[in-house]
From Swiss-Prot:
Biological source species: Bradyrhizobium diazoefficiens (strain JCM 10833 / BCRC 13528 / IAM 13628 / NBRC 14792 / USDA 110)
Name of the protein: 5-oxoprolinase subunit A 1
Keyword Protein transport: no
Gene (UniProt): pxpA1
Function: Catalyzes the cleavage of 5-oxoproline to form L-glutamate coupled to the hydrolysis of ATP to ADP and inorganic phosphate.
InterPro entries tied to this protein: Glyco_hydro/deAcase_b/a-brl, LamB/YcsF/PxpA-like
Length: 255
């Protein structure tokens, strides 16, 4: 079985680092690089792109809302046109940095509140998908299954890669449990290993209510800001490889 591992990376600013990006880059097949609004800055973005190139890792834009203090997790009211411009700005910045480093951007993966907006609002999803297709029709859109952005992306001819979030709890409707609730973030390597093995074996996840639901995904996400993220990502890779799987970049998965 071929499957990807991806992580949101470069989510610091200045001298602040949220995790060991270098160690994480040795584990993943795709890096979603913060583009300066919720986290990241030009120096960090450049470092991430060059490190990804060195490690043979694909790079994607990880745009978020302009909310450095809230790490892009707070809702900011804006219409679809405003959201589109904020996204385009960030993708363009990473494209330029990647070109300067001799690498290229292959995908887009939305961060937190921005992701929630395009996942839930069909009008916003349509506007954003059209903008991505205008920038580069070869871009792959990373998202959760059944999100509006997946529908909108496919409508305009973009490829999509759906995700299983190994470090986040799901409810019985297949939605992520709010981070405000207990046990919404999975930090135990044993629990992550069990979840990944179950997903690989049966395509299911156990919800926070204890039920089993199907999850359709081609790549497994670990958030870099989850405590112990490097160990968790290493656990994901180990479970995949011990089961005979192959960690594979997104562009290869969708060929």
């Amino acid at each position: 079985m071929k499957i990807g591992i991806n992580s949101d990376m470069g989510e610091g600013f200045g001298n602040y680092r949220i995790c060991d990006d270098e160690a994480l880059m040795s584990i993943v097949s795709s890096a979603n690089v913060a583009c300066g609004f919720h986290a990241g800055d030009p120096i960090i973005m450049d470092r991430m792109v060059r490190l990804a190139k060195q490690k043979g890792v694909e790079v994607g834009a990880h745009p978020g809302l302009p909310d450095l203090l809230g790490f892009g997790r707070r809702v900011i009211q804006m219409d679809a046109a405003e959201l589109e411009k904020h996204m385009v700005y960030q993708i363009g910045a990473l494209q330029a940095i990647a070109a300067n480093a001799g690498h290229r951007v292959t995908h887009v993966s939305f961060h937190a509140a921005m992701g929630n907006m395009v996942n839930a609002d069909p009008d916003m999803a349509d506007v954003v998908a059209r903008a991505i297709a205008t920038i580069n029709r070869d871009f792959i859109v990373f998202s959760q299954p059944d999100a509006e952005i997946v529908r909108a992306a496919r409508k305009v001819g973009l490829r999509t890669l759906t995700l299983f979030l190994a470090d986040r709890a799901y409810d019985e409707n297949g939605h992520l449990v709010s981070r405000k609730l207990p046990n919404s973030v999975v930090t135990s390597t044993e629990a992550v290993a069990e979840r990944v093995k179950r997903f690989l074996d049966s395509g299911t996840v156990q919800t926070i209510e204890g039920k089993s639901i199907k999850v359709e995904a081609r790549s497994i996400l670990i958030h870099s800001d989850t405590p112990g993220s490097v160990n968790l990502a290493g656990t994901v890779r180990r479970v995949i490889e011990q089961g005979g799987g192959e960690v594979t970049p997104a562009t290869v998965l969708l060929n």
